[in-house]
From Swiss-Prot:
SUPFAM superfamilies: YggU-like. This is UPF0235 protein Rleg2_3707. Coiled coil: none annotated. Belongs to the UPF0235 family. HAMAP family: UPF0235.
Length: 103
């Protein structure tokens, strides 16, 4: 299975599919869409207005990986369900944390 992240020199780019108003804040695993692109399924309880769901997503990812939320930023998908996050840090370490997170 493809992994929903790509390692760079000093960061990782993580593909996300976010469901706002999802009942709880959670990471529901990785999936692949019809085009073969992998993404991390996530949901937050926050409503999708004025960037609230994006902020909740960044907090969820940072907390799940045990990193500062300032290390996580939204690269694309501000108003879309599919998003790309940039996570600053050691790519090898982040890759291991993401592998552990997915089980």
């Amino acid at each position: 299975m493809n992994r929903p992240w790509k390692k760079s020199d000093d960061h990782v780019r993580l593909a996300i599919r976010l469901t706002p108003n999802g009942g709880r804040d959670a990471i529901d695993g990785a999936e692949t869409d019809g085009e073969g692109e992998a993404y991390l399924k996530t949901r937050v309880t926050t409503v999708p207005e004025k960037g609230k769901a994006n902020k909740a997503l960044i907090l969820l990812i940072a907390k799940s990986l045990g990193i500062a939320k300032s290390s996580v930023s939204l690269v694309s998908g501000d108003t879309a369900r599919k998003k790309i996050l940039r996570i600053d840090g050691d790519p090898e370490d982040l890759g291991k944390k993401l592998e552990t997170l997915l089980g």
